[in-house]
């Protein structure tokens, strides 16, 4: 651990001014966070008269060396960071070096501490604004104890603004609940006027953590809460989400970023949107913990550290939203149906009729020509999956779902409603409040993001010729005059899809936003490739950017939405280095990747029937001629 030292003026000026001492709860927050930063496994909090008379924090952390005690009470003195680079990747609670100095300036503060290397403890005492520090020997185990006596004794005006002892203690108790949930490994005790009020024992396993969750949020929330576990690259979301079937109105709304409790409308909106089809839950309860690369979040944007700024806020929002939606889906609470991952499937799926006029249950067209029944509703709701694994279970009853992927289809960029329970925002923001979209709007928008199926220009169109019989689930049996041939359905599907795409390429394809953008390592020359082929990329409906040596895939045309984008897009960019593909080649590339989902044989036949005669003939020429006459002759000769 770094030693305590005065921050350089340049670094001190870069740090947002702290609103450290607002009320007794503010003092408890700062001091307990210091204990946690010092590696304490136990923190005891003693309060007298709501904190106005006494606040005493005792921990078993690493302690403060004797020669740093006086320095610890100086302004802008901290062991948490020393350079501007440290400020860009903060994982500790404290970093400004203002807490002890601010607290000692409005109280009588005594700091007693001992490190493991010292044979005796030392005590520092400071009182009031003069901040003169006296250091003397003391008796104390390894760790620190801080006593704050007579808070605001020298600022009567601020003391008069304190509420009743009960109210001030309630604020302290509420803050302790928040820290108890994110630091389940810490033993926390809270005493008021000599009476133990809280005793949060360390939670070393899930069952013990659920006991702590019950203490903080109540049994109704803890027993039915859905457990969230989701990992994707440098993002990890964990915690508990209120069960949609729970009738209890929960006031548990806690969101942590790298262990720091923050107020953020982003996660509030994501939770509301995930529950959009559960109108009876106006504000579901949640305890969510987001772990993110500290370089991707700025915790130095709010004086009291209540807010953070994400470098990619939309990405974080969509990640949280998708994780919560997937958890609710797995719990069986939303009417979304997952299919298995379609990215690994290379064959066309069709509905197999038993005859030319009678259509049976859908089946899978596989390489082994086996017929596999598929539920009809799955065809309508098949969704792509990505690699992020989400594990869901009911915390109280122990119901656990299997790991599964999260969807990549996106709800659009919706305005974030203001949460009245969080922070003070400007009047301008207040006027911009937007209600959540209706169920119909969400369903309509979701339908726009489905991979297109075969469609005909006229919905009432009926093919002039009846669809031929299907052989082995892979071929149409074509009979013309004295010829009998097999036309591969897969070839027809590919050809008709190529015709459809090539016709749309002239005006440009419409890109669909990914709910969770895909990120892959970028080659050094990819930026040049993107710049050179910008028009072509936009024509295909792609939105690609490069940030921090990563290719970010934000939008794709619907035809490749179900593909392995992390593989397909880089391979395509590699090919652009050598040549610019013709429209027909682009259409074939998109069509090939679009045929990994479910399609209908009648729809393929209808699309084929609408083609011009010369194009139909080109496709029909791919039919495999059956030598039925010679076979009959052989049979007759026997």
UniProtKB/Swiss-Prot annotation:
DNA damage is among the record's keywords: yes
Region span, Disordered: 404-433
GO biological process: mismatch repair
InterPro entries given in the database record: DNA_mismatch_repair_CS, DNA_mismatch_repair_MutL, DNA_mismatch_S5_2-like, HATPase_C_sf, MutL/Mlh/PMS, MutL/Mlh/Pms-like, MutL_C, MutL_C_regsub
Keywords for the protein's UniProt record, in alphabetical order: DNA damage, DNA repair
A molecular function GO annotation: mismatched DNA binding
GO CC annotations on file: mismatch repair complex
Protein name: DNA mismatch repair protein MutL
């Amino acid at each position: 651990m770094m030693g305590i030292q005065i921050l350089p003026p340049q670094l001190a000026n870069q740090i947002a001014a702290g609103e450290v001492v607002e009320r007794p709860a503010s003092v408890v927050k700062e001091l307990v966070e210091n204990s946690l930063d010092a590696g304490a496994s136990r923190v005891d909090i003693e309060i007298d008269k709501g904190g106005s008379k006494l606040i005493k924090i005792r921990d078993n952390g690493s302690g403060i060396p004797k020669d740093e005690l006086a320095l610890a009470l100086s302004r802008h003195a901290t062991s948490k960071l020393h350079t501007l680079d440290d400020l860009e990747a903060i994982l500790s609670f404290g970093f400004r070096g203002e807490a002890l100095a601010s607290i000692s300036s409005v109280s009588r503060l005594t700091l007693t501490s001992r490190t493991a290397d010292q044979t005796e403890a030392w005590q520092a005492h400071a009182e009031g604004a003069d901040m003169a520090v006296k250091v003397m020997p003391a008796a104390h185990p390894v760790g620190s104890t801080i006593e704050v006596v007579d808070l605001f004794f020298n600022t009567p005006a601020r003391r008069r603004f304190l509420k009743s002892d009960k109210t001030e203690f309630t604020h302290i108790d509420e803050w302790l609940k928040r820290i108890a949930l994110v630091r389940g490994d810490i033993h926390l005790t809270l005493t008021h006027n000599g009476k133990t009020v809280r005793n949060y024992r360390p939670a070393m396993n899930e069952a013990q953590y659920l006991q702590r969750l019950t203490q903080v949020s109540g049994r109704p929330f803890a027993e039915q809460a859905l457990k969230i576990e989701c990992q994707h690259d440098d993002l990890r979301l964990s915690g508990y989400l209120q069960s949609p079937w729970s009738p209890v109105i929960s006031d548990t709304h806690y969101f942590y970023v790298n262990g720091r409790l923050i107020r953020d409308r982003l996660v509030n909106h994501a939770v509301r949107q995930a529950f959009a089809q559960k109108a009876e839950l106006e504000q579901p309860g949640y305890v969510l913990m987001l772990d993110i690369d500290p370089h991707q979040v700025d915790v130095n944007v709010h004086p009291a550290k209540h807010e953070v700024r994400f470098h990619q806020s939309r990405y974080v929002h969509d990640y949280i939203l998708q994780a919560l939606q997937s958890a609710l889906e797995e719990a069986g609470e939303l009417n979304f149906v997952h299919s298995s991952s379609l990215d690994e499937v290379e064959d066309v799926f069709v509905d197999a009729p038993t005859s030319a006029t009678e259509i049976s249950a859908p089946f899978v067209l596989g390489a082994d020509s086996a017929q596999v029944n598929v539920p009809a509703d799955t065809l309508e709701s098949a969704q792509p999956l990505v690699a992020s694994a989400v594990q869901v279970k009911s915390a109280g009853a122990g119901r656990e779902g299997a790991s599964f992927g999260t969807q990549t289809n996106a709800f659009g960029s919706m305005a974030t409603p203001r949460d009245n329970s969080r922070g003070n925002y400007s009047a301008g923001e207040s006027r911009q409040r937007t209600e959540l979209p209706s169920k119909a709007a969400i369903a309509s928008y979701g339908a726009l993001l489905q991979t297109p199926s075969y469609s005909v220009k006229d919905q009432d169109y009926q093919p002039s010729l009846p669809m031929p019989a299907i052989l082995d689930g892979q071929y149409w049996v074509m009979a013309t005059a004295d010829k009998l041939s097999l036309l591969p359905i897969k070839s027809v599907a590919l050809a008709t899809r190529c015709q459809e795409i090539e016709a749309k390429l002239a005006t440009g394809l419409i890109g669909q936003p990914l709910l969770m953008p895909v990120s892959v390592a970028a080659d050094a020359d990819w930026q040049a490739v993107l710049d050179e082929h910008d028009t072509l990329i936009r024509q295909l409906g792609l939105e690609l950017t490069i940030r921090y040596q990563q290719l970010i895939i934000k939008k794709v045309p619907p035809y490749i939405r179900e593909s392995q984008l992390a593989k397909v897009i880089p391979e395509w960019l590699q090919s652009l280095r050598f040549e610019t593909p013709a429209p027909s080649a682009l259409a074939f590339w998109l069509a090939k990747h679009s045929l990994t989902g479910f399609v209908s044989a009648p729809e393929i036949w209808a699309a084929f029937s609408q083609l011009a005669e010369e194009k139909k003939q080109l496709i029909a020429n791919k039919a495999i001629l059956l030598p039925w006459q010679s076979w009959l002759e052989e049979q007759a000769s026997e």
